[in-house]
């Protein structure tokens, strides 16, 4: 029997999903007993029903819903369990096809721990609107049921994993589809499909239900971002597997969590929301650190610790620091050879530099010490100099090589900092040569200077950086505190 005849057959004998409709408009798509209303493509035996669960275990196969299947605006809920290293997902606005990955519609990603195949490393995690609005943080563990909720109204898509919202995307008109992406990845209408990605990916599904919404339904307040060159590049980089994450976002100057998340979703940049911890900073002890981590519980963002000054390692315990997703610091606060503590961005603390070469040699020495001994994952504001100093002249090849070499040797990623446009191109090229990883970072003072990785994009294009050159927490040998936890108190 051909694929299309099978589709007609299954639709005819199993178009009974409507029988499960509840009074509030919800319709069960899975009866808990059979594959009625569904059609498996490519490798039919991959999909099975057992103990009330819809399961995939076998070679690649996509299971298409074939009931009353022309959905435009809708709300869908499902409960999902992913086994270790599972790559799966739910497609919407798609259509049945005989083989391959769906060429129409969008996918809500299910991937907690799948690493990828061959040299490819999948960065897009559960809750992503795949390759359009990506989630880079693992939000749920393997072997645990979680709820997926998808709400599509007009040009707006919203996604929740359990009670955590991961996506609020409003598609521009016309849709922006980057090169290499499926050409029919735009909001339209169609059916649903579940993904069996490969033989090693095993997932379970239950309680799959949907309710139609009016064709003219709209999401209150939804507005598409302005489509400019940066918008196009960010979507393209996300589709190409660059982890588009700004790890240096601060809740300052009136920027709060709702405001930050609205910007993140609109711009298509995932965030690491970081607090300043250390001597003279808003957080100076474990209690404050733990309170901050708890304040971001239920938010789809990395939780970052900006370690300020050189005293921080003795102020916080390993247990408290371990609650953060990553730690970053810079070489902007240090004590000179005469015992003078200074913050380089404050002219009154720096004062008049009598011997510039000695100042630079001390800075290099301090930076190498920070990178070599402190348990940090990212070197932020890299190679910063006080205002008025000639960066290109003073950061000689020899000095740069000492600092970059220390970062490479200690597995510390280097931030491409938007605020200060640092490091310079020479340092980026050297860091790439020495196989350092990179991150994006705004270092904002409020909502007004929260950026879109523009300087990082510039360095990608000038220096030929590729997606494997970029760091994400947990992808390259674990956290720094796991390697250098002994530097911390307790």
Where are the model-predicted features located?
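An N-terminally biased module of ancient metal coordination in phosphate/nucleic-acid-related enzymes
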Residues: 226-311, 378, 382, 386-398, ...
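Short, charged, surface-exposed secondary-structure boundary motifs
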Residues: 119-120, 282-283, 336-340, 448-452
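Extended substrate/RNA-proximal surfaces in nucleic-acid metabolism proteins
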Residues: 285-409, 461, 465, 485-489
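Charged catalytic cores and adjacent phosphate/nucleic-acid-binding surfaces used
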Residues: 226-241, 391-490
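Flexible loop residues that form catalytic
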Residues: 95, 213, 332, 384-387, ...
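N-terminal secretory signal peptides and thylakoid transit peptides that target proteins
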Residues: 1-16
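Carbohydrate-interacting regions of secretory-pathway proteins
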Residues: 22-227
